[in-house]
């Protein structure tokens, strides 16, 4: 399905990419999206968000057990964005369209996954080791030795559960990578 909010965000992004500034119509659309979500006053004004966006801070990322992770929307073609307005538009899309299955298409369109060519991504789940949750299971249930009988990833790697690092023979054990060919989608000869 297609939502009006998605259409408005598409317009805002396209208009900004074309003109490199937000026109009055884009600002009014953005305010309408925020007001529909319950924001009022300055919180509904996109200029407030843009003015508060520090790209140096956004690009610091956050550190987890595997190192530093970033918002993939802060990158295009393997390069970090420097434009707080464009990043704010992308962040608005991420927030407003959450769980609607559009994020993947956005990341492909922005070529945001280029950064995985240099730095593989480790998928991490819940915080398992050194938490009360660890005590919920017996030693037989939490085998983390990397053998074929292992049930969880090793505590030596990170405190978080890594589903692809349970056994060392997993083809994604060293993380998910990316190649340019993966941006292409196959087209059927007949439909």
For the regions a language model picked out, list residue spans one by one:
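Acidic/polar-rich alpha-helix caps and helix-coil junctions
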Residues: 1-191
